[in-house]
A protein has these predicted regions:
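Solvent-exposed interhelical
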Residues: 58
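Extended, alpha-helix-rich binding/interface surfaces that flank or overlap catalytic cores
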Residues: 63
């Protein structure tokens, strides 16, 4: 038996689509900021970053690409309208924070020192 959250199909699809679109836009904005700064986008090698990107979308969130993925997952959950699917974005956020973001932050702190510390104080991790 599937439990569904009551919401008009059209309204749900519009909301889901808007969330997915917002997530894609965030991801693209993050990618373009890295390309503009001519630095690596490889999440497995944050120590290879040649520049600390703090402009554009990075003025509002330190992790627009991960935030974009979480919002896409939220859009998918809204589209499916099944309560268990809403765990996806939460679990993704917890996992990516522990196993990707925190290690990236350590590498960036080691590489950029006080500049990264000031950025970290100024801009939130997610929102």
């Amino acid at each position: 038996m599937t439990v569904r959250i009551p919401m008009g199909v059209v309204a749900r699809e519009i909301l889901a689509g808007a969330l997915v679109l917002a997530g894609v836009v965030l991801g693209i904005a993050g990618t373009l900021a890295f390309r503009s700064a001519q630095t690596t986008i490889d999440p497995h090698r944050p120590e290879a970053a040649s520049t600390l990107v703090v402009d554009g979308i990075y003025r509002f969130t330190r992790n627009p690409m991960y935030l974009g993925l979480a919002i896409i997952l939220l859009g998918w959950a809204v589209y499916l309208a099944a309560p268990p699917t809403f765990a996806g974005p939460v679990l993704f956020g917890l996992y990516i924070t522990a196993f990707q973001i925190v290690p990236e932050e350590r590498a960036l702190a080691a590489k950029f020192g006080p500049e990264y510390a000031a950025y970290r104080e100024r801009v939130r991790r997610w929102l």
